[in-house]
Regions:
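N-terminal catalytic cores of NTP/NDP-binding nucleotidyl/phosphoryl-transfer enzymes
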Residues: 28-105, 221-253
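Secondary-structure transition/capping motifs at alpha-helix termini
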Residues: 43-46, 75-83, 107-116, 139, ...
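Short, Lys/Arg-enriched N-terminal segments with co-localized hydrophobic residues
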Residues: 3-18
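A glycine-rich helix N-cap at a beta->alpha junction
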Residues: 100-126, 132-135, 140-143
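Active-site cores that bind ATP or allylic diphosphates and position pyrophosphate for catalysis
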Residues: 90-92, 135-296, 355, 364, ...
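Substrate/cofactor-recognition hotspot
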Residues: 333-634
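Long, charged, mostly alpha-helical binding arms that flank functional sites
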Residues: 275-354, 358
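Conserved short loop/turn motifs at secondary-structure junctions
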Residues: 55-58, 87-95, 117-127, 150, ...
Length: 640
């Protein structure tokens, strides 16, 4: 899988405990679900066992919301010395594929979790589920309804009116068993009969008004082929799957709140005694500017708005992997968002913050110029080239490593770092002004060369040879520091800058047909003439970098390998919600992400002058709203 370990740059190593079944409990969290688990363990409710499960339906790719569920279920099992099952809820033959089975496993392993020997499929329980249904029929608690589906829906009533009993509700157990068996044998067409629970047509919970347990569907199942033509529905099957596997805590998102009553009814009446599984609901994750619904992503793929399920603008885990998001960042996001009973939309900036927190401590720094303009240093010896020793990490990152950066009389700088008519507060290169080239020299702008249309062709400067390494011996102050790339030595790359795919902060609330109307036309910018220092050519292709003063990048694992250089921006460098320099205390980060780092292994050369990266001198003050958000998050997390 891409984005894994490499010897060329510092990486976060997955904790060994995340890749095997835990041997004992660690320090549990304090959210309401963990409080329930703690109490159950203390009372030996399940003999002290803790068994959770992550039960995706293999009908699509996992998204960031699923990552929260994975972290919660596997995390609780790990904290309490239990186990977490991976179970595919594959009871729908129409939509499920082995392709999704494989991608889900890849996503879970990428996040740093492992189900070990506990991989299960609901389709393996079909016979046992059928036998449980027969138990309900024999007890007079389930019946075969021969009404059309529309009549069944209308007969359920409304939230203010009771339902109407089916004319087939009082069939004898013998007749129901006969019809149920003939349904399994394939005697009837799709939709001709259903099996319903016989509960309460006047229940205030409409899910308890004789819910459908089985339907007829003549379709080939991706695992079972044509063995079955009747299939159980979620509310009947899910609780049984938990009971068969002796799950202790069945954790669902809030939309299944009303299903809990039916969950308990099925298990109790089939004959599972206490202590049996119980369902607990949490709010889940709703990420702004993102569509998490598979049903709504599919039309975008079909219409060619995005090319498949892994384009980096999507919120699927396979898309995050391709973009270069480290899995530790999603684990940290899970901690930042937390577990609650009330839902709230999570700002996309919080995910960006989590990504920066991880990459700031691991990504080697290199120089790149996205929108280049040429600078000619007129008093630099013609044909000369020299090298500067540049560290990969700033002083506040506890990693070592450096590389050599070539310098020549012609260099590239960012077009935005030069201004003929600078605004107030501009601290970069201006006519007659000086600027510091990172690690190199101080230069002064002497002349601007333009073409006939007034576009700048090059900027001619002179350098102060006494300022090697960036320091001024006479103590004069230089406005700012900018990155650069040597013209004859730099490599050309394509860079892809991603923004939110949707303009609306809540696109998941839109109808599927209207989703396309909310696409951000500027969500993808492709720059084909980016210049990067040549040191990147010696690194492994899955190295994540900080392009200084720009953002975090890595090579696209599909379009970028080999001779072609294609870099994806993982996240911009600017923090839109946290105060500069503010971070979670090291102990908090260590607890939340279980990370350790390995130093960059590039050879370190001796040099007469070693330069540390100073703070970004171009960063401005963050806006008051961002500061307020950061302070709120700090309070929520309980950190100083």
């Amino acid at each position: 899988m891409s984005g894994g370990r490499h010897s060329g740059a510092a990486v976060f190593l997955l904790p060994s405990s995340a890749m095997s079944e835990p041997k004992g409990p660690s320090s549990p969290g304090t959210d309401f679900i963990r409080q329930v688990v703690t109490a159950d363990v203390a009372s030996a409710r399940h003999g002290g066992r803790v068994v959770t499960r992550f039960p995706p339906e293999p009908n699509g790719y996992l998204h960031v919301g699923h990552a929260m569920g994975i972290c919660l279920n596997f995390g609780i099992a790990q904290e309490f010395g239990g186990r977490c099952h991976l179970r595919y809820d594959d009871t729908n033959p129409d939509t499920e594929k082995n392709e999704y089975v494989q991608s889900i496993q890849e996503d879970i392993l990428w996040l740093g979790f492992d189900w070990g020997q506990h991989l299960y499929f609901a389709s393996d329980y079909f016979e046992r589920m059928y036998e449980c249904a027969e138990v309900l029929v024999k007890k007079g608690l389930a019946y075969v309804d021969s009404q059309p589906n529309e009549a069944i829906r209308e007969g359920r009533g409304t939230v203010t009116e009771s339902g109407v009993a089916s004319p087939f509700r009082d069939r004898s157990a013998e007749e129901n068993l006969d019809l149920f068996g003939r349904r399994r044998a394939g005697e009837f067409e799709d939709g001709e009969h259903v099996l319903r629970g016989k509960i309460d047509m006047a229940s205030p919970n409409m899910l308890m008004r004789d819910p459908v347990f089985y339907r007829i569907r003549h379709a080939s199942h991706y695992r079972r082929g044509d063995d079955w033509c009747i299939y159980p529905l979620y509310d009947y099957a899910h609780c049984l799957e938990d009971a068969f596997e002796e799950v202790t805590h069945s954790i669902c998102t809030l939309e299944f709140d009303n299903n809990r009553e039916l969950y308990d009814w099925v298990l109790e009446n089939v004959g599972f005694e206490e202590p049996r599984p119980h369902q607990y609901e949490w709010a889940g994750l709703d990420l702004e500017n993102a569509v998490l619904s598979k049903r709504k992503i599919a039309p975008l793929v079909e219409a060619g708005v995005v090319s498949g399920w892994d384009p980096p603008r999507l919120a699927t885990l396979t898309a995050y992997r391709r973009r270069g998001v480290p899995p530790e960042a999603l684990r940290l996001l899970s901690e930042l968002v937390g577990i609650s009973k009330t839902g709230a939309q999570t700002e996309a900036a919080k995910l960006d913050y989590a990504i920066r927190q991880v990459l700031n401590q691991s990504a080697p720094r290199v120089m790149a110029v996205l929108d280049p303009i040429k600078v000619v240093i007129t008093n630099y010896p013609s044909g000369k080239a020299e090298e500067f020793e540049a560290p990969y990490y700033p002083h506040d990152v506890p990693l070592e490593g450096s590389r050599t950066v070539p310098f020549s009389e012609e260099i590239w700088i960012e077009r935005a770092d030069f201004s003929e008519h600078p605004p107030k507060g501009f601290r970069r290169l201006v006519p007659g002004g000086e600027v510091r080239l990172r690690y190199a020299y101080v230069i002064r702008c002497d002349e601007v060369i333009k073409d006939d249309t007034g576009d700048i062709l090059e900027v001619r400067c002179s350098y102060d040879s006494r300022t090697r390494g960036g320091s001024t011996s006479d103590g004069r102050k230089v406005g700012g520091t900018i990155q650069w790339v040597s013209v004859p030595h730099g490599v050309t790359a394509e860079v892809r800058l991603f923004d939110h795919l949707f303009l609306d902060e809540g696109p998941d609330g839109q109808d599927s047909g209207a989703i396309g109307d909310h696409i951000n036309p500027d969500s993808l910018t492709i720059i084909t003439s980016t210049k990067i220092e040549p040191s990147v050519l010696a690194d492994q292709e899955d190295t994540r970098y900080q392009f200084e003063r720009t953002g975090y990048f890595w090579r696209d694992p599909i379009d970028g390998p080999g001779d072609r250089l294609v870099f994806n921006r993982i996240v911009p460098l600017k923090d839109t919600w946290g105060k500069r320099g503010t971070s979670l205390p090291p102990t908090k980060v260590e607890i939340q992400t279980s990370l350790r780092v390995e130093a960059h292994s590039a050879p370190k050369r001796e040099a007469s002058q070693q330069t540390r990266i100073p703070p970004d001198e171009q960063a401005g003050e963050r806006d008051a709203e961002a500061v307020a958000r950061m302070e709120r998050y700090t309070r929520e997390l309980g950190v100083g």
